[in-house]
């Protein structure tokens, strides 16, 4: 579960496991062009970075783990609903991205289901990831899509 703080000078996301225990946290750099997020475990060890590539018509994000770029997420042009291309082993996003109820697939295998909880103070997202090995990348994908949606809304 991801919870965004409502009143903060920088965006901070607290990420909890299925039992409500803190598992990760995300810090967003404040004075940057484009989004730049660092994901940490509870021992303050950085586990990944998401940064927005600038000079693109639509939002593009690179996902780095261990200093290596492992994925790229790009918003595609679409008239009515947001669509994304994910450059990672054929992963695809399907569902209602505006309503925050969507799935991430690898072929026909559902990797993750993402939904937004309503009537909460601040944005709260629930992420169900089927395989623990996909947890970090699945989490980073959700954060990048959230940032891309925010980028488009502020344009």
Task: Label each residue range with its predicted role.
Residues 1-155:
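Intrinsically disordered, low-complexity proline/glycine-rich segments
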């Amino acid at each position: 579960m991801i919870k965004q703080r409502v009143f903060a000078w920088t965006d901070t996301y607290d990420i909890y496991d299925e039992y409500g225990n803190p598992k990760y946290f995300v810090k967003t750099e404040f004075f940057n062009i484009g989004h730049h997020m660092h994901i940490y475990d509870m021992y303050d060890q950085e586990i990944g970075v998401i940064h927005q590539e600038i000079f693109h018509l639509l939002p593009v994000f690179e996902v780095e783990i261990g200093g290596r770029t492992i994925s790229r997420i790009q918003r595609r042009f679409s008239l009515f609903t947001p669509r994304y291309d994910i450059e990672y082993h054929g992963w695809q996003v399907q569902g209602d991205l505006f309503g925050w109820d969507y799935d991430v697939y690898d072929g026909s295998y559902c990797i993750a289901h993402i939904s937004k909880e309503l009537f909460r103070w601040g944005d709260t997202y629930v992420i169900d990831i089927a395989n623990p090995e996909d947890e970090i990348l699945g989490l980073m994908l959700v954060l990048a899509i959230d940032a891309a949606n925010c980028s488009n809304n502020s344009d």
